[in-house]
Amino acid sequence: MRTAISILVWLGAGWLALESLPANASADPATELTRCAELELRVAGLLRVGTALLYLDQCSDAKRILEPVPKKFSLELARPFRGQDLVATARSTLKQNLALRDDEDLPAPLRCMADAYVDADSGDRYDVVFRPDNGLSMYLNGELLEQCDASSGAEKYFMIWFGEQPFHRRMRDRLLEQALNHSGPASS
């Protein structure tokens, strides 16, 4: 069951429901970035699987989400996920967006980050952070899992969620729309 849920969520099953959360919902207090968007993720509109959050320096940077601007994508889990399922889906989604055939063709920083996923339980939180001067970092519950170099193209890891072929198009669109319409002060 856990594997099926992971695959459905990460591959973007057509019936994954997205619900906006109120602006005062909790966010990571340690971030220097502004929480610009937050969506609850549900399978079939019933089963809550988690919450997706987007952080940017300025919410208007959502227009440049795939450019080398500071950003963070967080996933708060409401269900357990197997790391190997997330690794496989991250690699597959990146290859689709970059028009690559083999895992070995993925640029090193993207492969490094895709391989960082580990098994996680309900209540855990993944944070993927890109800073132009520091590269990519992945955290689980605030603990660093992996840091990958800042070589050219590392920001493209965010294609998983925001590329032309994201794992879920409606989630991408709703997060970006929320960020561009964000008018309140930074949430923390």
Q: What positions do the PLM features span?
A:
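Positively charged n-region of N-terminal signal peptides that target proteins for export
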Residues: M1-A4
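Bacterial N-terminal signal peptides
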Residues: S6-E19
